[in-house]
Curated annotation (Swiss-Prot):
This is AUGMIN subunit 2. Contributes to the assembly of the acentrosomal spindle and phragmoplast microtubule arrays as part of the augmin complex. Part of the augmin complex composed of 8 subunits. The complex acts on microtubules and interacts with gamma-tubulin in spindles and the phragmoplast. Residues 218-296 are annotated as: Disordered. Disruption phenotype: Lethal when homozygous. The keyword Lipid biosynthesis does not apply. Residues 56-83, 253-285 form a coiled coil. GO terms for biological process: cytokinesis by cell plate formation; microtubule nucleation; microtubule organizing center organization; mitotic cell cycle; spindle assembly. It comes from Arabidopsis thaliana. Pfam families: HAUS2.
Length: 296
């Protein structure tokens, strides 16, 4: 609403209706305000045409927006599908499936061979060293089995040697590391030597104690014609000391010489006893000198 400027409604007082828009307009006209005229038919048509064009534009934009939304939804679905394919690609890939097929075919072939040769496998398991795989005559099978056993042990030793050789080839440490590794070996050898010497001394002491015990028992026994043989048997049957594990040729020679010395000592003691007995006999048979003089 504007004052003046439009004289169309000037002097025309709108019909006053109580409580309506016309009442307000009439009051405004009384106050001197000019009321805008109602739009004409042309204006209404132009306004409708402009509104129609705007509505068409809005509809077109909405359609384009719906198309874009559909495309976005399709892209989201495709992206999710590609993510799922990436997660299961190692399971559904053509190359992986071919590998699995080859593995299954190989396992199937092995199982078929096992089923076909089950009797032979059972027989070989029951006889681990059967020689049906190598043609050998019956008379040489025992020797061949022993040869195989020896070859197995030699093969184990060869395998250990090969592993040691491989280790020596792969060991590429500097000489300082070699020195650190070889340094404790002399100390260990010295301790082993001392331990061996202590064990040897203890063994000799046990042997000496055993000989003394056997000698005392031999002296306490009465002398009989077969006494020497009995003492020898007793000395031979004595249980060796527990500390002694292995005997060398030197130990055997030492024991032999000791036994010979013991035998000689026993023979000398027997000879002395016989001489004492003879002297006693002569002493009993001889007359005292006083008796001889009286008889004379």
């Amino acid at each position: 609403m504007s004052m003046g400027g439009d004289t169309t409604w000037v002097g025309k007082k709108p019909i006053r209706r109580i409580g309506g828009l016309s009442d307000a307009l009439s009051i405004a006209s009384d106050l001197g305000f000019a009321v805008a005229p109602p739009p004409s038919q042309e204006e209404l048509q132009s306004f409708a045409s402009s509104n129609g064009e705007r509505g068409d534009d809005l509809i077109r934009v909405l359609r384009e927006l719906s198309v874009v939304q559909r495309k976005i939804a399709d892209l989201q679905v495709e992206l999710q599908g590609r993510k799922d394919d990436k997660n299961v690609a190692h399971l559904t890939h053509v190359g992986e499936m071919q590998k699995k097929i080859e593995t299954l075919s190989r396992i199937t072939q092995i199982l078929k061979d096992v089923i076909q040769n089950k009797d032979r496998i059972i027989a070989r398991l029951q006889q681990p060293y059967s020689l049906d795989c190598i043609p050998v005559e019956a008379e040489y099978q025992k020797q061949f089995s022993e040869l195989l056993m020896k070859a197995a042990s030699d093969y184990g030793a060869l395998t250990a040697s090969v592993s040691d050789f491989q280790w020596s080839q792969n060991f590429k440490e500097p000489p300082s590391v070699w020195g650190e590794m070889l340094r404790p070996i002399p100390v260990a050898l010295a301790s082993c030597t001392r331990f061996f010497e202590a064990m040897s001394a203890m063994r000799e002491s046990f042997a000496t104690l055993q000989e003394l015990r056997v000698g005392n028992s031999a002296v306490s026994l009465p002398t009989t014609p077969g006494g020497n043989e009995m003492t020898h048997r007793d000395s031979d049957c004595v249980t060796p000391p527990q500390g002694r594990i292995e005997s060398s040729f030197d130990d055997l020679a030492v024991h032999k010489t000791r036994r010979q010395n013991n035998d000689q000592n026993e023979e000398e003691e027997e000879e002395e006893e016989e001489e004492d007995g003879n002297n006693n006999g002569n002493r009993r048979l001889s007359w005292p000198p006083s008796v001889k003089k009286s008889s004379v």
